């Protein structure tokens, strides 16, 4: 949402006697006296982040720095909350966040359970620096951040920097890669360990669910559909977020 990243300045009648500049609050209704001769200027906000003021659980999306070219590329708060609940985070152990992006899931898990060892993996250039900055904002420290394609890691069997996961989040990759991850890491996981897979493509659910069950995971499937309110002239309307399926497997 742009209002989380920019201030909106309404400039009216520029160069004329009635020139006026004012800051807009887009969470409220627009002023009724806006001149027809206007332009809106967006200025990027600079915020000071202090983890002292953050909630323990349910951190707002705007706290996380995201990719400059994809500012909305993160797991939204409403979905992230459910993923963290489904992970049943232990006090101690190892969690892998594959397709970590800006690190929102793994880092919030680490804030909830500081004694966990977090391993973040994402292939996108710049993801490591992004996760490091967000870890500073949240006041947590991942054990290891790998800016690499998980396929390359699994194909070369270069798993020496990693510890066996007790909790595994598999996001940000296609069905074939998800299946390969399950096949490769299943032998590393023990009774009680949990995998959570966010899915937006309904067609992939059946095969992933069957693969987990073949590996002796007990599965559960939830659909997360949320709406956010937007202010309009008449009051308010609800804007739907993209629906997300959460497939959970418990060993």
Give the location of each predicted region.
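Short beta-strand element of Class I
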Residues: 115-119
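A short, conserved alpha-helix within the catalytic core of class I
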Residues: 175-184
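Conserved alpha-helix/loop element of class I SAM-dependent methyltransferases that forms part
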Residues: 74-91
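S-adenosyl-L-methionine
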Residues: 121-165
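A contiguous loop/helix-start segment that scaffolds small-molecule binding in enzyme catalytic cores
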Residues: 1-70
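Conserved class I S-adenosyl-L-methionine
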Residues: 92-101
